[in-house]
Amino acid sequence: SLNIISHSFGGRVAILLASSGEIEIDKLVLIGAAGIKPKRSLYYHYKVLKYKIIKKISPEKAAKMGSNDYKQLSMGMKSTFSNIVNTDLTPNSKLIPCKTLIIYGKNDKETPIYMAKKLHKNIKNSKLIIIKKAGHFVYLEQFNIVLKYVSLFLNS
């Protein structure tokens, strides 16, 4: 049997893999998993529009904008990265058949709690654990607690 433990972007990969039906997965652990379409503020849309305008006027200046991950990519990879991180995996999450443990830090800003709740609602055979005093790197911030839940889940 195959068990998968993933975090953040790895959660995207795990959701796609688990929902594909191509590999039989016994148990899946999603920790601060990405993949649910984020709620975007008006300010976010303003920044995207500003970036698109600057990109047309000054591509050099636009290249200095964005997240650190984005800035380090080659021009060819930037569009691929944007497509991947903007793909909503909500429909895929509904197709996951395996037992799934979803762990999120209560203070996660990168993948907020509403995403965890949506995954839990969509994945029929899932359990949701929200850990206090932890953010996106819950597995580092509350290592012993995460280890306990993951161990109990995998050994059950």
Predicted feature locations:
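Generic structural signal for small/hydrophobic residues in well-ordered secondary structure
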Residues: 32, 84, 102-105, 146
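Short alpha-helix in the alpha/beta-hydrolase fold that links the catalytic acid
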Residues: 98, 112-121
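Hydrophobic, aromatic-rich cap/lid helix
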Residues: 63-91
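Flexible "cap/lid" loop of the alpha/beta hydrolase fold
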Residues: 12-20, 25-56
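Catalytic histidine neighborhood in serine/cysteine hydrolases
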Residues: 120-137
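Alpha/beta-hydrolase fold nucleophile elbow
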Residues: 1-9
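Short beta-strand/loop motif that positions the catalytic acidic residue
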Residues: 95-96, 102-104, 108
